[in-house]
Design a protein with these regions (language model features):
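N-terminal signal peptide c-region/cleavage motif recognized by signal peptidases
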Residues: 16-18
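A broad, structure-centric signal for solvent-exposed, well-ordered loop/edge residues
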Residues: 7-8, 124
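Residue-level micro-sites within transmembrane alpha helices that shape
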Residues: 3, 179-180
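N-terminal, motif-rich segments that launch catalysis or mediate targeting to/interaction with membranes
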Residues: 20-175, 182-350, 354-368, 372-396
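Bacterial N-terminal signal peptides that target proteins for export
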Residues: 1-7
């Protein structure tokens, strides 16, 4: 099944063709699950009011869409991405201006691009500890609670980051998805010789920036290449099949896109295997299934405030990030501009599960939890005493 971008209006799902490249599909899946969880609730009504009618599914991709403004100067007009919500558009422009794509000389203002990730070393036993290697004052683990505090009325909407309550909702809809993508949290580090290292043990090391510098080579692609070489030598016709899924893909893009498609295809097959189900599963059925079936171990630690949840989620996904690297062999590693790049080739694993199948299984689990967690963190943030005491500002 070819999944299309999914949006949700109140309790009714409808489809729209994608207009942007956990790519948009993953983010909108998370947002659509949360939309369904909150539909018909007082919190859902607050979300609709704050977002001027747009859904969390639509809101979930806006933090990536504004990256399209990054080529523009601060004083240049920004393309309209919310033509029917001019106040939201204005607030997003103010947010972009306060957190420019590049740091101005002598400025302490962070860039909004830093808010989407953290670079904790992807090694066994690794934990997110503020101030340690790979963390930043405005990384994703810090920005999620910042948005929570804005929604809860504990952080004024006049803050230096220009994050109003509507913008906080937009950012949460995106960041909660990002923090459930393993390469947005864990980072591989390499020695000058191109070997994977644990940077905490000392010595100079170079990050892979979430896999963006590595081209992923899956087993079927590797076999197809070998078959093609055999054909050229023998003249015989190759029987090897080459998958086009990850051709030319870097490792980060694989997790943003291919793993999501695999995850949703696996979900579709589970639905179709149910005794009473007839025909192909629809996109709406997949979202409804994920929204209605409670994920395993998705709840936060008992009595922990929502401002602590991002760190819990980061620590939960770090082992997955480590495994995402351990299932690959890194070769042809080069160091340039303090960053590592090269090839990442799928290993044959003892469990017999391919990298694509394994990543799809894990991504389905993470998308599922992320959708439920997005709904819960919004509900917890908007229903504190402070948030109830303040009227939401529709325009700043």
């Amino acid at each position: 099944m070819r999944f299309r971008i999914i949006t949700l209006s109140c309790a009714t799902l409808f489809l729209a063709m994608p207009v942007y490249p956990y790519g948009a599909l993953g983010h909108e899946t998370v947002g659509a699950i949360a939309d369904m969880k909150l539909a018909g609730t007082p919190t859902g009504a607050q979300v609709t009011k704050l977002l001027d009618g747009i859904t969390l599914a639509r809101a979930s991709v806006l933090a990536d869409e504004i990256k399209g403004w990054d080529r523009l100067k601060k004083d240049q007009p920004k393309p309209i991405i919310l033509k029917d919500q001019p106040q939201l558009q204005e607030q997003l422009v103010a947010f972009w201006n306060a957190n420019p794509p590049t740091k101005a000389k002598g400025s302490d203002a962070p860039t909004h691009k830093e808010f989407h990730y953290t670079d904790v070393p992807a090694v066994d036993g690794s934990k997110y500890v503020k101030g340690n290697l790979g963390t930043e004052p405005y990384d994703i683990v810090q920005m999620i609670p910042f948005c929570v505090r804005v929604l809860a009325g504990e952080e004024p909407e006049t803050n230096d980051r220009k994050i109003t309550k509507p913008v906080a909702l937009i950012l949460l809809a995106h960041y909660v998805g990002d923090i459930h993508q393993p390469l947005h949290v864990g980072n591989a580090y390499f020695s000058s010789a191109g070997n994977l290292v644990n940077p905490s043990k000392g010595g100079k090391s170079f990050p892979d920036h979430g896999g963006n510098g590595f081209n992923i080579i899956l087993a079927d692609e590797k076999n197809a290449k070998s078959d093609a070489q055999g054909e050229s030598k023998s003249g015989a016709k190759s029987s090897g099949k080459k998958s086009s899924k990850s051709k030319g893909n870097n490792l980060h893009s694989f997790w943003d896109t291919d793993a999501v498609v695999e995850a949703l295809n696996q979900a579709e097959k589970k639905i179709e295997s149910q005794p009473k189900h007839k025909g192909k599963a629809t996109d709406e059925e997949v979202i409804a299934w994920l929204a209605n079936a409670e994920p395993v171990e998705w709840k936060a630690k008992a009595k922990s405030p929502p401002t602590d949840w991002a760190q819990q989620w980061a620590n939960e996904i770090l082992p997955m990030s480590t495994q995402a690297h351990e299932r690959l062999e890194f070769t042809n590693v080069t160091i340039k501009s303090e960053s590592a790049s090269g090839d990442a080739t799928e290993k044959k694993m003892p469990d017999g599960i391919s990298y694509t199948e394994w990543s799809g299984q894990r991504t389905q689990e993470e998308l599922h939890k992320a959708g439920w967690r997005l709904a819960e963190i919004i509900e917890a943030s908007l229903n504190t005493k402070n948030s109830q005491a303040q009227k939401p500002n529709s325009k700043k």
